[in-house]
């Protein structure tokens, strides 16, 4: 049996958007994604449906190779408003970083992803309307999350912090200069 998807009527798009948002809030992103695809089949440029579709895809991120990062990126970069493109691309990178963090990925990859998100949020902040602090709130969250991720120490710090350095008179002088005594 061949299955052919049925089309919704253009007059029901508003109710369908509300239903897609509700499914996202119920943590059922696959349902929201399906509804958005039905809306976009009728109105391919519907901005709210595109936003919810992209967010629904990011809701499904697990930090694995099967995450549909590129698909969500294409959706967000196709948004009409420059502010929306920057803001939602920032969310894409932030959510990707959080999924990688939950999956135990290396700190360097997570840090780079959060920094990319912050770059997009800074751009959105410059483009924002009056009384719209969404981008600032997201930037601050990324900054706080970055503070919790261990940073690799520089080579110089590793030398001075290592307890395995053999005792040598010049070592004691160096340790004294940096404020560390044995």
Question: Predicted segments — roles?
Answer:
Residues 57-78, 88-123, 148-162:
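Short coil/linker segments at helix-helix boundaries
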Residues 11-35, 99, 103-104:
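Alpha-helical segment of the N-proximal tetratricopeptide repeat
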Residues 1-7, 30-36, 66-74:
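Repeat-mediated protein-protein interaction surfaces in helical alpha-solenoids
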Residues 10-15, 43-57, 80-103, 133-145:
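Amphipathic alpha-helical repeat scaffolds of TPR domains
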Residues 42, 75-79, 127:
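Structural marker of alpha-solenoid helical repeat scaffolds
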Residues 2-4, 126, 131-182:
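Terminal, low-structured helical/coil segments at or just beyond the last alpha-helical repeat
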Residues 1-15, 76-77, 108:
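TPR-adjacent "capping" and linker segments in tetratricopeptide-repeat scaffold/adaptor proteins
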Residues 25-61:
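N-terminal interaction modules that seed assembly of large macromolecular complexes
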């Amino acid at each position: 049996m061949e299955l052919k998807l049925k089309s919704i009527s253009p007059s029901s798009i508003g109710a369908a958007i509300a239903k897609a948002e509700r499914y996202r809030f119920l943590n059922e992103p696959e349902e929201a994604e399906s509804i958005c695809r039905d809306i976009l089949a009728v109105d391919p440029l519907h901005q709210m449906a595109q936003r919810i579709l992209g967010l629904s895809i990011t809701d499904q991120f697990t930090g694995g190779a099967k995450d549909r990062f590129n698909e969500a990126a294409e959706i967000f970069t196709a948004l009409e408003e420059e502010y929306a493109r920057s803001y939602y691309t920032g969310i894409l990178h932030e959510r990707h970083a959080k999924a990688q963090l939950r999956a135990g990925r290396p700190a360097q990859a997570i840090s780079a992803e959060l920094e990319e998100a912050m770059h997009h949020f800074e751009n959105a902040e410059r483009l924002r309307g009056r009384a719209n602090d969404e981008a600032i709130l997201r930037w601050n969250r990324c900054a706080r999350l970055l503070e919790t991720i261990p940073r690799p120490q520089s080579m110089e710090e590793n030398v001075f912090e290592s307890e395995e350095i053999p005792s040598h008179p010049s070592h004691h002088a160096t340790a004294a200069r940096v404020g560390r005594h044995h």
